[in-house]
Amino acid sequence: MNNAVGYAKPTERSNKILLGTDGIGADMIEEARIAYARLREFNVSAEPTTVWQWLENSLELFPDAKQDVVSFDYDFADSPWHAAFTTNMNVTDVEIAGEKVLTNSQPTRVDLQEVRAKANEQALRLYERLS
């Protein structure tokens, strides 16, 4: 839906559907919530379980992800129905292949202050070149 790519009415085709993101948002629960709302535009009887299956189908591309652990600040984030009707469910912790990469909503592998400082330096440098 971003970048004016449109909406393909995915349930009208027989091929397997996977829900993903092009990186602009990268919030897959929010993408699923929006996909469910869009699905209901042309099928009012559609259920969130359809879209949830699209999320699960993506695990076929990344089977190792089945072992990863993702925790949310909402107790029922693993429910298709709750995910479809609840906004602002935030990831709090992520463990990938036994390594904690997000703890208390903060990355563990990078220093955010350093990343932001370097990004600011580069933005100023670019601005100077463009001026």
Predicted regions and their residues:
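Active-site microenvironment of metallo-dependent hydrolases
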Residues: 37, 53-131
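Active-site-adjacent C-terminal substructures of enzyme catalytic domains
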Residues: 1-77, 85-86
